[in-house]
Amino acid sequence: MKKLVATAPRVAALVEYEDRAVEAHEVKIRARFGAPKHGTEVVDFRAASPFIDEEFNAEWQMFTPREEGTARGIEFGKFQLGNMIVGDIIECGDDVTEYQIGDSVCCYGPLQETVIVNAVNNYKLRKMPQGASWKNAVCYDPAQFAMSGVRDANIRVGDFVVVVGLGAIGQIAIQLAKKAGASVVIGVDPIEHRCEIARRHGADHCLNPIGTDVGLEIKKLTGKQGADVIIETSGFADALQSALRGLAYGGTISYVAFAKPFAEGFNLGREAHFNNAKIVFSRAGSEPNPDYPRWSRKRIEETCWELLMNGYLNCDDLIDPVVTFTTSPESYMTYVDQHPELSIKMGVTF
């Protein structure tokens, strides 16, 4: 049996593992499809994550150094790559009552041939409806962060909306914004293929930020007013600077990205100072949710799964390219790390 592991920063490999029997509360899934996470996971893969030497302390609600002698947050050689898997249950523990052998399911899990997960009171272990798209299923995670960004931005009917960064989260945000009633939806991404897909699924316009004054172009497309809402998923300083320039007076930037450190030159003066800009940091996994107690991470997940399985969201175009598990180390290094412009969200078949 093999699993996909980061053996060193920016190096992926298939490594042998020994399978085990399930415990009473567990099921074993034979993976058929899967996908990695192109955002935070690749930051970890590049050894650029704050979680390596620090941890987010829930009591203090801040990053603090890991205690001396404790394991690092990411240990290369043990760090498994992958985010979602779809497959069939091949073994059930004695206490499992909601699932049976042969069920097709989707869950969080690394890219490996078999995955063992808790199957007692685990709503994250999702049964796949008959005929459901595996490509939609592996977008379960990015859909949550897209929905959170849209909700936290408070998009309303008639709004002018911009989505910066057209990876999986941005593409799903485009669909949600348009379906929420936005009158003008603008995508921003330098990759034309991504822009084509965004136009196919709701974007009225797309802008290439390279060599373009994105803020000015947003103002031109909205009759000089600017965007009511900008959803920023890229994490780059230039993108946020352009968003502040293209935002309408009193508008909201929903900041979804797990940002990289900003270089010298980022400016919170200029348009941000004059136009009463609001920046809301949006993260589906942070509890309590801004709309607690009505909304929680669980409700976001339940809603996203329903929208993915009933076809309200269409992610078939987003899973690109699709590679085999056998070639996944080289494919991961190429499409996820070295040349992310060649992919949106890489799919894996077993």
Enumerate the language-model features and the residues they cover.
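Short N-terminal strand-loop motif that marks the start
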Residues: M1-G73, T349-F350
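Residue-level marker of beta-strand positions
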Residues: E26, D103-S104, T114, F160, ...
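A glycine-/small-residue-rich N-terminal strand-loop-strand element
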Residues: G69-G109
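A structural motif shared across PLP-dependent enzymes of the aminotransferase-like
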Residues: Q80, G109-N121
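Mid-domain Rossmann-like dinucleotide-binding core that forms the NAD(H)/NADP(H) cofactor-binding site
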Residues: S133-T212, L216
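Glycine-rich cofactor phosphate-binding loops and adjacent beta1-alpha1 units
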Residues: I155, H201-V280
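C-terminal hydrophobic helical "lid"/dimerization subdomain
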Residues: L244, Y249, D291-F350
